[in-house]
């Protein structure tokens, strides 16, 4: 599904809190770069990583699963393989009341999960990176 720049910009403007599923604490991993960038742009990042639950990262408690989140979340950003998407989406839909957007990172698509979330009124973005889109849409892309 093609999405417009206006649609993406509206999502990124309205979003305040992002649960990042699969966020790595390893500074060389793409999920770390994305989380750090979004955090420095004022987004509240809730890290979700089963291997690091209970630690703190970006000033937030790392949750082992979506089920451990007990605060409002606007977006779930998925950094996991496509096979993991159905469980993440189902858990997010069941637990995160008020959730507005499911975002699947570059290389991640899952049509039935995307369709399910859309049918419930959520925005769904597949195969894109919010860091790249934010930089592009808000004029922060820099030449190397």
Label every model-predicted segment:
Residues 2-82, 86-106, 110-144:
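Structural/interface elements that position substrates and couple domains in central-metabolism enzymes
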């Amino acid at each position: 599904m093609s999405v417009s720049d206006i649609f993406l910009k509206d999502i990124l403007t309205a979003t305040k809190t992002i649960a990042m599923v699969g966020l790595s604490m390893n500074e060389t991993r793409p999920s770390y770069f994305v989380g750090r960038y979004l955090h420095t742009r004022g987004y509240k990042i809730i890290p979700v990583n089963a291997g690091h639950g209970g630690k703190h990262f970006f000033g937030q408690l790392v949750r082992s699963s979506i089920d451990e989140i007990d605060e409002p979340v606007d977006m779930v950003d998925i950094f996991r393989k496509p096979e993991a998407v159905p469980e993440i989406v189902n858990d997010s839909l069941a637990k995160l009341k008020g959730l507005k957007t499911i975002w699947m990172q570059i290389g991640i698509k899952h049509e039935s999960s995307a369709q399910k979330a859309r049918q419930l009124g959520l925005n769904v973005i597949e195969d894109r990176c919010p860091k790249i889109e934010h930089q592009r849409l808000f004029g922060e892309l820099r030449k190397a």
